[in-house]
């Protein structure tokens, strides 16, 4: 009977932080496996926000989600890690030898250590809370933007008040014929620089309004608005409506993996160690004092977790070197 291969490090989650962690593990010459539940690598950045422009990634004045994921994939393949997509991790058992068996939708895998980089978990968009024809989705009503060209020379309304809604309104401004931004509050809760850019833009700000109804009108959409604590009920006629009310995440897998959590995510210490020795967590999946839900933060956490995992396996091995001494 053949002996099952045991990886040194298995990274669960193929978003930007997970991909970088797998690359860094290769930089440390670790035998690494990367598991992703979706059909493609990229996480939310690649699958939900490919056209969104990111401004807080070191070395990039600005970069789209799609281009960032492309660069990370190029970086990842340098050390030829084992990558398996469409693979959902169901449970993680610890074996008598102290290593782990990951039971997945594509079979079992063994690993000496595990790095969890699952982001916010499985995600679905918060839907518009009014009745509308589902056939409008993907044609006139959108929850995701795969390609900005879909909105070229169109009258577009964006609904939402957070960073994502503001970012999309600004990204669509030079592409669309005109953009309106609908929010139920008088003030937006986005980054100060983004709000300042919005106020200087040509985007029409519709606040404080709720969407009362969305109905087809010829080849357009009629959006009935209702003023919050007021009587005004204007109608906005657009070609396309983009809803940005955030996402509902499903983190049931964390319970199945027996990891301690709080309301924000997986509890970790300063070495990114979870409540189960040998299992580490990084990125938006984790919770600790001062944690920021940024890709940039996750990029910093990845080397910490990888180096700690390798120190656990090989206490006498030299500590991490600078990349100029490792990369070839």
Curated annotation (Swiss-Prot):
GO terms for molecular function: ferredoxin-NADP+ reductase activity; flavin adenine dinucleotide binding; NADP binding. It catalyses: 2 reduced [2Fe-2S]-[ferredoxin] + NADP(+) + H(+) = 2 oxidized [2Fe-2S]-[ferredoxin] + NADPH. It holds the Pfam family Pyr_redox_2. Keywords: FAD, Flavoprotein, NADP, Oxidoreductase. It is an enzyme of class 1 (oxidoreductase). InterPro entries: FAD/NAD-bd_sf (IPR036188), FAD/NAD-binding_dom (IPR023753), Fd--NADP_Rdtase_type_2 (IPR022890), Ferredoxin-NADP_redctase_2 (IPR050097). Binds 1 FAD per subunit. Its cofactor is FAD. Its EC number is 1.18.1.2. FAD binds at residues 36, 44, 49, 89, 123, 284, 324. Homodimer. Belongs to the ferredoxin--NADP reductase type 2 family. This is Ferredoxin--NADP reductase.
